[in-house]
């Protein structure tokens, strides 16, 4: 061994690397310029012989074995850095030429690290995770992970025989970030991180930022390049950015991709089902689902979580791979096709997202580097006793950054139109689901989670700032105020909130036998007292058809399926008329008999029965009516868009209301009868004189009803009803919803009235002589009278002269 080379050895550092306990292995490994020359060191445990080959000259320099564990070194006569490769001969006789991972610099800037440490690196997913890339002339995969308390982190996989000594990662100062570029690797390889905790115990972890995962029950991460897909939905995205969704129709079909439609599982040579063969690929299901959605008239779909999760029974709500679409249905490119195809069919896609908790699986986020990286250490703060899951530490910048960037990731990389945030109430309350002594109050002694509040405001502010039309929806089940209010007004900043209060009250009401509903009339009308306190979405979600709750049809009262179906039609019709956007879980549109089971397909076979096929037709008609009538969506969040007509008829269990816009001719009248009584001549007050045409009736035979409809247009009469001067008389079928279009009585235009007045004036003028003519006539008559008087005077004088002459003769 050369003395110069021996003197350059850091034997303590070599021991750290050999025992794989070095937090910063590139302090030794790779090229280092010294006074004696260019020192190159490498550690390959299974290597028998190594040599350095300079790229510029092709000259080879044998490396000396400095530690029999596989640590080699060579001193090259050069005072500057030089590009090189390593010629490796393994102990099994095989040899290869590789590039040294430790000859490549960091991909992080100081700005990247500073932003991450502040929790504001919203594009951190471009750094963290595994990224196929080219560095200089070298192609390979760049790995990065955050493990702040780890002694050492390595990338392991088939490519290095899962040996954690081979590719030990570089630690970037005190940031807790580890990174390494491994040349020669390609997309498709599986990998994990081997993390040594502070006690020196190794753990295998999936990549928290990994873009793809193995199919369960395997759980390794898979390298994938998500930048290669060719999108064709630019027109959709541009239109979305310019559109205010609150003034547009939003009717959402909630879907679990794994059970909406399934295939017969394939069998292997032993007769066992092939894992995952029961699922349709993202590409296959995209075509089938889009065709169904368009026919049914929905505007959006909402997917139960597609992020990777190990347990089918969690429905996706116990996520381990937040940055990876589940491999159950295909690759990331397949899911991109799904999203792109939906947009080309003008269908929006909302993704369920779970920032409230995560599972304890040993390969996941729990105890990530041997410490509580993502969760709280104190179980009173960091665990859900009922769910058995862990709670995020929202006060830690790296955790906030992980979650906020993840929400943005699905919008930016997969073009999601929005996210629906699950279990927000569990985030906001420190005592959620806990008994006294099981939780820790905040600094003010209250039960509000101040850190979660700040996190939600932060996330929603970032989304608002993008101005791309993507929305954030909260599933918040309490009366927490200002969920959808602006952050500047001390709100949480969500775009929409699920109206759980309406759902619970209405389901409680509708499940009563119609005879008893008159005693619960307030549950039907109560929601309008707070309808404008938030921007609500009305939901009949998956939560209402599981855990023994039965299907929506099963909740309805009635001795026969026909009676249940009539109640269900009334429920759906009332929901469509009530202010707020709409959501319905799959299978409930055709009245599925059984509650939802994630392990099998929906009961599509029931559509062979007219009751179910006609129920499906009814929901289809409701959706198309909804989209065609601006009154049903333009003023969802403006009190001017709704007006009660009848909200006191508890005896008959009837309510009536108007949905309105600024245009009278777009007004709709809803009459809802939740009783079993028929009313042949029911008087209804109307907003103005005009014609009222029934455009939908849930009792129509086309929807499975008895056909007790109002087939003729109703002309209003000047007869007071419901404190209105105009009214109509209609037939009200039992358990039915009627919708009437309202056409105001036509008034003669003001221009025509003026024309009539002018014509009458001209006619009068023509019939009467002019003033000048009258004056001439009067003057003529005056002259005639004067002449007549003169003649009379002359005759008198003549007569007097004659009398005088006669007297003189006498």
Spans of features found by a protein language model:
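Carbohydrate-interacting/catalytic domains
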Residues: 1-248, 273, 283-293, 562-565, ...
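Conserved alpha/beta catalytic core and glycan-binding cleft of carbohydrate-active enzymes
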Residues: 415-417, 432-599, 606, 627-684, ...
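Short, flexible loop/turn elements at secondary-structure junctions
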Residues: 67, 147-149, 173, 184, ...
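Short glycine-biased active-site loop of nucleotidyltransferases that positions the nucleotide triphosphate
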Residues: 64-65, 170, 311-316, 360-367, ...
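Hydrophobic residues within beta-strands of alpha/beta enzymes
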Residues: 50, 153, 301-303, 419, ...
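Substrate-binding/active-site clefts of carbohydrate-active enzymes
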Residues: 213-214, 234-247, 256-448
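Arginine-selective low-complexity/disordered segments
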Residues: 771, 775-776, 781, 785-791, ...
């Amino acid at each position: 061994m050369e003395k110069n080379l021996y003197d350059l050895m850091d034997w303590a550092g070599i021991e750290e690397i050999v025992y794989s306990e070095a937090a910063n292995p590139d302090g030794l490994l790779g090229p280092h310029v010294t006074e004696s020359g260019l020192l190159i060191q490498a550690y390959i445990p299974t290597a028998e012989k190594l040599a350095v080959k300079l790229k510029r000259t092709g000259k080879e320099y044998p490396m000396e074995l400095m530690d029999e564990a596989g640590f080699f070194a060579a001193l090259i006569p050069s005072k500057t850095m030089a590009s090189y490769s390593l010629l490796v001969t393994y102990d099994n006789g095989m040899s290869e030429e590789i590039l040294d991972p430790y000859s490549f610099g960091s991909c992080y800037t100081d700005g990247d690290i500073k932003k991450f440490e502040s929790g504001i690196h919203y594009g951190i997913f471009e750094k963290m995770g595994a990224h196929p890339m080219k560095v200089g002339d070298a192609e390979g995969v760049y790995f990065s992970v955050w493990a702040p308390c780890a002694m050492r982190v390595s990338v392991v996989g088939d490519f290095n025989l899962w040996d954690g000594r081979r590719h030990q990662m570089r630690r970037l100062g005190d940031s807790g970030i580890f990174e390494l570029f491994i040349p020669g690797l390609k997309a498709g390889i599986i990998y994990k991180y081997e993390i040594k905790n502070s006690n020196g115990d190794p753990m295998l972890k999936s990549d928290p930022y990994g873009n793809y995962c193995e199919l369960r029950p395997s759980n390794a991460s898979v390298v994938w390049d998500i930048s290669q897909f060719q999108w064709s939905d630019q027109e959709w995205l541009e239109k979305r950015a310019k559109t205010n969704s609150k003034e547009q129709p939003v009717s959402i079909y909630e879907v679990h991709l794994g059970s909406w439609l399934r295939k017969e599982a394939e069998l292997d040579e032993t007769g066992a089902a092939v894992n995952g063969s029961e699922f349709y690929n993202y590409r296959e299901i995209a075509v089938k689902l889009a065709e169904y959605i368009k026919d049914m008239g929905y505007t959006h779909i909402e997917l139960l979580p597609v992020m990777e999760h190990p347990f089918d029974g969690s429905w996706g709500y116990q996520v381990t791979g937040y940055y990876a679409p589940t491999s159950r249905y295909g690759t990331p490119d397949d899911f991109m096709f799904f999203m792109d195809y939906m947009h080309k069919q003008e269908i929006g896609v909302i993704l369920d997202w779970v920032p409230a908790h995560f599972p304890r699986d040993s390969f996941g986020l729990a105890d990530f580097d041997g410490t509580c990286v993502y969760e709280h250490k104190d179980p009173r703060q960091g665990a859900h006793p009922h769910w058995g899951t862990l709670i995020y530490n929202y006060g830690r910048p790296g955790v906030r950054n992980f979650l906020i960037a993840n929400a943005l990731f699905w919008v930016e990389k997969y073009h999601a139109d929005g996210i629906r945030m699950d279990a927000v109430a569990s985030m906001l309350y420190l005592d959620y689901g806990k008994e006294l002594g099981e939780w820790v109050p905040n600094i003010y002694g209250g039960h509000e989670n101040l850190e979660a509040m700040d996190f939600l405001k932060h996330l929603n502010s970032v989304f608002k700032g993008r101005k791309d039309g993507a929305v954030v929806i909260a599933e918040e089940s309490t009366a927490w105020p200002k969920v959808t209010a602006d952050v500047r007004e001390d709100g949480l900043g969500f775009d929409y909130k699920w109206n759980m209060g309406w759902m619970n009250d209405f389901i409680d009401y509708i499940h009563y036998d119609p005879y008893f509903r008159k005693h619960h009339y307030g549950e039907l009308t109560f929601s309008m007292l707070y309808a404008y306190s938030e921007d609500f979405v009305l939901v009949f979600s998956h939560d209402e058809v599981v855990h023994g709750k039965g299907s929506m049809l099963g909740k309805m009262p009635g001795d026969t399926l026909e009676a249940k179906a009539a109640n269900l039609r009334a429920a759906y019709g009332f929901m469509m008329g009530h202010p707020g956007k709409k959501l319905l879980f799959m299978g409930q549109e055709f009245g599925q008999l059984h509650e939802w089971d994630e392990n099998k397909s929906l009961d599509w076979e029931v559509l062979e029965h007219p009751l179910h096929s006609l129920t499906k037709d009814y929901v289809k008609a409701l959706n198309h009516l909804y989209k065609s009538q601006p009154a049903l969506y333009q003023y969802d969040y403006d009190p001017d868009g709704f007006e009660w007509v009848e909200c006191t008829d508890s005896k008959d269990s009837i309510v009536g209301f108007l949905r309105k816009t600024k245009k009278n001719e777009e007004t709709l009248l809803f009459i809802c009868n939740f009783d079993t009584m028929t009313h042949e001549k029911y008087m209804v007050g109307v907003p103005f004189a005009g014609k009222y045409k029934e455009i939908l009736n849930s009792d129509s035979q086309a929807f499975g009803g008895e056909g007790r409809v109002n087939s003729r247009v109703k002309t209003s009469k000047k007869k007071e009803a419901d404190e209105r001067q105009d009214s109509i008389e209609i037939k009200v079928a039992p358990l039915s919803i009627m919708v009437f279009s309202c056409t105001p009585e036509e008034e003669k235009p003001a221009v025509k009235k003026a024309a009539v007045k002018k014509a009458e004036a001209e006619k009068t003028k023509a019939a009467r002589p002019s003033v000048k003519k009258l004056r001439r006539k009067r003057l003529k008559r005056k002259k005639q009278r004067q002449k007549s008087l003169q003649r009379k005077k002359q005759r008198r004088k003549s007569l007097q002269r004659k009398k005088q002459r006669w007297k003189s003769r006498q």
